[in-house]
Amino acid sequence: MYLVVTRTFPPEVGGMQNLMWGLARSLSKLNLIKVFADYNEGHEEFDKTVSFSIERVSGIKILRKYRKASLINEYLNQNPKVSCIVADHWKSLELIKTNKKKICLIHSKEINHKKGSRLNQKVLNVLNNVDHVIANSNFTKKLAVDIGVEEKKILVINPGVDPIKEIPKNDLKKAEEILNGKKQ
C-alpha cells in the first residue's frame, strides 16, 4: 500500500494539483493507495468519483499541518502494509515519523532558501532523510545539490501532460466570456 501526502489536490485547479492527481491515479493502478489531502470546498463530489480513499484535513493552515501529520502517523502505526509514502513537498513530510520508504517531489521555488538559514536546515533535514528526491527539472536538481541535498538521492522527472478528453462546459463558458468580453 502507498500513501500520497499532498497539500494540493483536485478539485482545486492548478499545475501541482494536476500532477498529484495523475500520480495518485497512476499509483492506484499498481497498488492500493490512500491520499491525505488538504480540505477543498466541493471535494465531496470529486472524491466520490475516484477508486481510492481520500482523507481530507481541514482547519487553519498552521494547525492543519500538525493535525494532518498526527493523522498520518496514527494511520502508519495502524497499517503495517504501507510500504511507501509519496509527498508533494518537503513540508508534507516534515512531521512524519516512520522508517517506511519516502519519496519527495521538489520544485526550485520551495527549496530556494539561503544556505545555512533555518529554513535551509529544515529542508535538508527532510530531504536528506528520504529515500528518493524527485526534482522537476535539471535546474531544480542543481539548486538542491547546491543547497546541500545529497545528489545520489535526486532523480529528475520532468512534468508530463494529462490531456483531457472533453473540456468542461463551465470552463468553456468562462474562456468565452474572457475572450469575447469587453475591453477594460
What are these language model-derived features?
Residues M1, G181-Q184:
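Charged active-site motifs of nucleotide-sugar-dependent glycosyltransferases
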Residues E12, S92-E94, K102-R118, N129-H132:
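A short, histidine- and acid-enriched strand-loop-helix "catalytic/donor-clamping" loop
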Residues V86-S92:
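Short His-centered aromatic/hydrophobic patch
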Residues I167-K182:
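A short helix/loop element that forms part of the nucleotide-sugar donor recognition site in Leloir-type
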